């Protein structure tokens, strides 16, 4: 029986992967990697390693999650060392929990290798501290891809009134809705907000504004996915 490593590749800059994550790449017989993994990291793989792309775009998945789970199990049962390489951290909106469940159900040995998530790293590369002694004592990760209130389980009231800094993932297409919900539930229109496109990468771009102005700014600057959204007074440090 082989073993599976669920590895966080970090937010984009290849230098931000952990040493343990790098070792998992170097020893793997099979690597399954996602769209937001910097491909430079694949250069550390063994020359005879099988490398499989599992990238996902909004509304389009190269491989369905169930297929990925089955691959992990299949290769491990063949005695392979399998590295599942994910952007950021595997347990922060990376579906790593689902993959771990599948491995447990099949009795597959596995290990979690945490990675630096873009909610912290992209903000840092833009000069934004997600916490600050004077401005932010609380911080939350939020999934921003729910398209309407009918399918939205996010507790916007709690986020708007109870959290100082928000890092919102996968939210660019939903930006008008996100801003609307935050203002509806207590944030003022003057609340600072930043969008960081391709955070930590060579072509990173950052735009800033307020909840009341950012939708027009993003449209004018043509900011698209992948982008991290940071909301809170700490944005003023950018």
UniProtKB/Swiss-Prot annotation:
PROSITE patterns in the cross-refs? SUMT_1, SUMT_2
Q: Name one GO molecular function term.
A: uroporphyrin-III C-methyltransferase activity
Activation and inhibition: SUMT exhibits a substrate inhibition phenomenon at uroporphyrinogen III concentrations above 0.5 uM; this property might play a regulatory role in cobalamin biosynthesis.
Q: Name one GO biological process term.
A: methylation
Record has S-adenosyl-L-methionine as a keyword = yes
Enzyme Commission number(s) of this protein: 2.1.1.107
Cited Gene3D superfamilies: Cobalt-precorrin-4 Transmethylase, Domain 1, Methyltransferase, Cobalt-precorrin-4 Transmethylase, Domain 2
Catalysis performed (reactions): uroporphyrinogen III + 2 S-adenosyl-L-methionine = precorrin-2 + 2 S-adenosyl-L-homocysteine + H(+)
Residues reported in the UniProt entry to bind S-adenosyl-L-homocysteine: 11, 87-89, 117-118, 170
Q: What's in the keyword line of the UniProt record?
A: Cobalamin biosynthesis, Methyltransferase, Porphyrin biosynthesis, S-adenosyl-L-methionine, Transferase
Q: In which pathway does it act?
A: Cofactor biosynthesis; adenosylcobalamin biosynthesis; precorrin-2 from uroporphyrinogen III: step 1/1; Porphyrin-containing compound metabolism; siroheme biosynthesis; precorrin-2 from uroporphyrinogen III: step 1/1
Under the heading Pfam families, the entry gives: TP_methylase
Function of the molecule: It is a step in the biosynthesis of both cobalamin (vitamin B12) and siroheme.
Q: Which family does it belong to?
A: Belongs to the precorrin methyltransferase family.
How this chain assembles, per its entry, is: Monomer.
Q: What is this protein called?
A: Uroporphyrinogen-III C-methyltransferase
Species this protein is from: Priestia megaterium
What gene is this protein a product of?
A: cobA
């Amino acid at each position: 029986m082989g073993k599976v490593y669920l590895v966080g590749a970090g937010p984009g800059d290849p230098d931000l992967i952990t040493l343990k994550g790098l070792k998992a790449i170097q020893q793997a017989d099979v690597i399954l990697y996602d769209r937001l993994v910097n491909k430079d990291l694949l250069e550390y793989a063994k020359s005879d390693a099988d490398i499989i792309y599992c990238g996902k775009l909004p509304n389009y998945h190269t491989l369905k999650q169930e297929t990925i789970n089955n691959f992990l199990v299949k290769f491990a049962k063949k005695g392979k060392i399998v590295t599942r390489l994910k952007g950021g951290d595997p347990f922060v909106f990376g579906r790593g929990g689902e993959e771990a469940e599948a491995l447990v159900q099949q009795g597959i040995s596995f290990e979690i290798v945490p990675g630096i998530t873009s909610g912290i790293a992209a903000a840092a590369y833009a000069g934004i501290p997600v916490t600050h002694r004077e401005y932010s004592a609380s911080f939350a990760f939020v999934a921003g891809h729910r398209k309407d209130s009918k399918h939205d389980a996010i507790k916007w009231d709690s986020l708007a009134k109870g959290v100082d800094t928000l890092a919102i993932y996968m939210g660019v297409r939903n930006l008008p809705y996100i801003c609307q919900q935050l203002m509806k539930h207590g944030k003022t229109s003057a609340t600072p907000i930043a969008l960081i496109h391709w955070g930590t990468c060579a072509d990173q771009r950052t735009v800033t504004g307020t909840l009341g102005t950012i939708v027009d700014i993003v449209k004018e600057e043509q900011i698209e996915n992948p982008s991290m959204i940071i909301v809170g007074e700490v944005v003023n440090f950018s």
